[in-house]
A protein has these predicted regions:
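Cleavable N-terminal export/targeting peptides
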Residues: 1-29, 249
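Transmembrane beta-barrel domains of Gram-negative outer membranes and organellar outer membranes
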Residues: 23-139, 146-149, 160-163, 177, ...
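Active-site pocket-lining/capping segments in soluble small-molecule metabolic enzymes
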Residues: 156
Length: 249
């Protein structure tokens, strides 16, 4: 009986991994959440895709994500955003039948609590609607500080569903660290931004990612990045990601 349950759990995890190459996106770096929060009444539209670099063996489905995030608090030192994403692989999988995911975040900017204080954020994402399949239910806490010349360093911790976030053996792999570096490359152009981020763990959520962004205008930018999954059995083949971000107004 235990072996049967373990096999069933792993099967669900692999199904969920077909959408594992994307996050129900709060304000992010390349892959992990950031401490940034959408300003009050700002509506953020994100159009992301994750395209596999190989179609041989393992998880090879591409993932497409359209999301809306809205800033909902009118305060300078305490900000909050909520969002919803429509995410699918186009394969009529179990995850595609429940494509809506929800996220929320509350945070404080740098220097808002006291001089030189870090930015802080707590939130959650990948709150799906199909229990045991899309309910990754990842919660997290992050701190970030911008250092002269170096850029912004972020660190935090996450915890999610032990039923959905599992490794290739069906064992829970539902928590770990969040790390990132990002910086506006002003030596080249104030429109150019670069980032590297990492989410630990052997579930489909674990990955090392890097990319660059170009701001075409104040409200429109495009990220191009590369995602290396910690565990090819659960995360699948590496992906190239493009992420179009548009803010209104």
């Amino acid at each position: 009986m235990n072996k049967t349950l373990k096999t069933f759990s792993l099967a669900l995890a692999l199904v969920a991994a077909t959408c594992g190459a994307a996050l129900a996106t709060p304000s992010t770096q390349i892959w992990i959440p950031s401490t940034d929060v959408q300003a009050y009444k700002t509506v953020h539209l994100g159009l992301d895709n994750y395209t596999r670099t190989s179609k041989h063996n393992g998880v090879t489905t591409n993932t497409y994500d359209a999301g809306v995030t809205v800033g909902v608090l009118p305060f300078e030192k305490l900000q909050m955003e909520v969002g919803v994403d429509y995410m699918e692989t186009g394969t009529n999988s179990a995850t595609d039948s429940s494509p809506f995911y929800f996220n929320a975040k509350i945070g404080t900017p740098e220097d808002s609590l006291f001089p030189y204080s870090p930015a802080l954020a707590v939130g959650g994402y990948n709150f799906g609607t199909k229990v045991g399949v899309t309910t990754q239910n990842i919660t997290y806490a992050l701190a970030a500080k911008t250092l002269p010349v170096i850029g912004r360093i972020s660190a935090g911790y996450y915890h999610g569903s032990g039923r959905v976030l599992v490794d290739e053996n069906g064992k829970s792999a539902n928590d770990g660290v969040l790390l990132s570096w990002d910086r506006t490359m002003s030596e080249i152009s104030d429109k150019l931004w670069a980032a590297v981020d990492y989410q630990s763990g052997n579930s489909g959520a674990g990955a090392l990612n890097f990319g660059v962004s170009w701001a075409f205008s104040k409200n429109v930018s495009l990220i191009v990045g590369y995602d290396i999954y910690n565990n090819a059995y659960t995360g699948g083949k590496n992906t190239v990601t493009t992420q179009l971000d548009i803010n209104f107004p």
